[in-house]
């Protein structure tokens, strides 16, 4: 037998070539089949065989992927899986690496979901550069959900706890069923027409794939994309991901998480305000210290340039010169007299009265500027303190009472949130803006 000169493979090289060909040519595939030989070792990976009446294929689903499966696979169960063909090179076996798994009953919906997801992604509805940023200061939130659902209660509870000053406008709508997507679109359009809120929170609680199917509507996706108001999608539980989550500007895993995302903790606001006032006080004290230091430095400079002191120095020098003249020889008297005349002329050019007048005017000007600067700074600080006091007032519980609300407590001081919390015979105290009422449950 004649040996070929080229294309001689080792077994590992051949298996590697086959793996690259299969993975490159087939890519991802969908498979509808029955489970057999299912095993789940301590590593957390799943190993199984998928089969029909005529053939079978070995499969693996690693733990990073099988964590997203919402049911426990069992032998004999019919499933729909998505995966990619690969080769396990040590044995030369070709296998399917599973990425997602659904019961066969959900298969049609899953295929529709993937097809719509790919279509909308190609149209650019998921692009990050088109997403609207959330407002920095949110004062009013529009909630699009069922008026009787648990999601609305969760949202209101979180907002009341974190920031009671945020107003909520509910746009009630059906969030399940054939007409739900159309009704949700109407709610979004109504909110955009009214322009009465800063942001929209589209939300509902968890459910099956069929329950959440309205949030996978193509019409709803375009409605969210075209909204002028920013939209936060908080649909289902953390493991649920709908088309609305991809299109929305921000996705929150649950209704409560959506409410927390859109609210700032009231205690944090108060702490930041107090910290701001403290920094303002320190800045004012620093400014006062600097002003006093500058005034002291100016005063020292003026003292060093005092005309009276300079005149005394000149007089002392003149006396010394007179003593020297008197002690000099007669032959130098004429010369010294001329020198004295020259010195007298120089002194007349440096009149102390003229310089004293200039320095006095300068001192008056600096004093006036210093007083005006202090008055202006005090005025600015007073305005800032008034604004800070107004902000504290808006988050005060007393502000809530001033709008007509009241707080009811039992004998232990616990605040009652539900009428069911009060029992017959309990003594209750209702606090109003001014005073309180005491009552007994009958």
UniProtKB/Swiss-Prot annotation:
For whether the record's keyword set contains Nuclease, the answer is yes
Keyword Transmembrane attributed: no
A Pfam family in this protein?
Answer: tRNA_anti_2
Q: Where in the cell is it found?
A: Cytoplasm
One GO BP on record is: DNA catabolic process
* Transmembrane spans: none
Q: What does this protein do?
A: Bidirectionally degrades single-stranded DNA into large acid-insoluble oligonucleotides, which are then degraded further into small acid-soluble oligonucleotides.
Spell out the PANTHER family in the cross-references. EXODEOXYRIBONUCLEASE 7 LARGE SUBUNIT
Descriptive protein name: Exodeoxyribonuclease 7 large subunit
Q: Which species does this protein come from? A: Shewanella woodyi (strain ATCC 51908 / MS32)
Taxonomic lineage is:
Bacteria, Pseudomonadati, Pseudomonadota, Gammaproteobacteria, Alteromonadales
């Amino acid at each position: 037998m004649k040996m070929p000169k080229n294309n001689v493979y080792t077994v590992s090289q051949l298996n590697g070539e086959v793996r690259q060909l299969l993975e490159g040519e087939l890519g991802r595939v969908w498979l509808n089949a029955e489970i057999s030989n299912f095993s789940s070792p301590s590593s957390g990976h799943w190993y199984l065989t998928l089969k029909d009446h005529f053939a079978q294929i070995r499969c693996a689903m690693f733990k990073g992927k099988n964590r997203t499966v919402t049911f426990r696979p069992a032998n004999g169960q019919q499933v729909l899986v998505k995966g990619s063909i690969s080769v396990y090179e040590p044995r030369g076996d070709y296998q399917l690496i599973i990425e997602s798994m659904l019961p066969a009953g959900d298969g049609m919906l899953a295929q529709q979901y993937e097809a719509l997801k790919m279509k909308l992604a190609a149209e650019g509805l998921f692009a990050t550069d088109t997403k609207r940023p959330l407002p920095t200061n949110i004062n009013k939130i529009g909630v699009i959900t069922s008026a009787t659902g648990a999601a609305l209660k969760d949202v209101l509870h979180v907002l009341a706890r974190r920031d009671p000053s945020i107003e909520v406008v509910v746009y009630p709508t059906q969030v399940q069923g054939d007409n739900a997507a159309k009704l949700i679109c109407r709610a979004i359009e109504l909110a955009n027409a009214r322009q009465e809120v800063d942001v929209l929170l589209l939300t509902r609680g968890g459910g099956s794939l069929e329950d959440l199917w309205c949030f996978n509507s193509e019409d709803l996706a375009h409605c969210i994309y075209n909204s002028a108001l920013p939209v936060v999608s908080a649909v289902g539980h953390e493991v649920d991901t709908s088309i609305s989550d991809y299109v929305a500007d921000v996705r929150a895993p649950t209704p409560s998480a959506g409410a927390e995302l859109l609210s700032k903790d009231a205690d944090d606001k108060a702490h930041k305000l107090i910290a701001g006032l403290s920094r303002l006080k320190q800045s004012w004290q620093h400014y006062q210290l600097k002003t006093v230091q500058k005034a002291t430095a100016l005063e020292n400079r003026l003292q060093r340039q005092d005309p009276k002191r300079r005149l005394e120095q000149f007089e002392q020098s003149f006396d010394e010169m007179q003593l020297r003249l008197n002690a000099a020889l007669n032959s130098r008297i004429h010369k010294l007299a001329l020198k004295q005349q020259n010195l007298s002329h120089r002194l007349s050019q440096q009149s102390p009265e003229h310089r004293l007048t200039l320095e006095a005017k300068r001192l008056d000007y600096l004093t006036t500027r210093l007083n005006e600067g202090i008055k202006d700074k005090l005025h600015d600080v007073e305005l800032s303190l008034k604004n800070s006091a107004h902000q504290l007032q808006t988050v005060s519980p007393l502000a809530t009472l001033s709008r007509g609300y009241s707080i009811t407590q039992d004998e232990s001081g616990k605040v009652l949130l539900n009428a069911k919390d009060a029992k017959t015979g309990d003594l209750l105290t209702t606090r109003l803006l001014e005073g309180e009422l005491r009552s007994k449950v009958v």
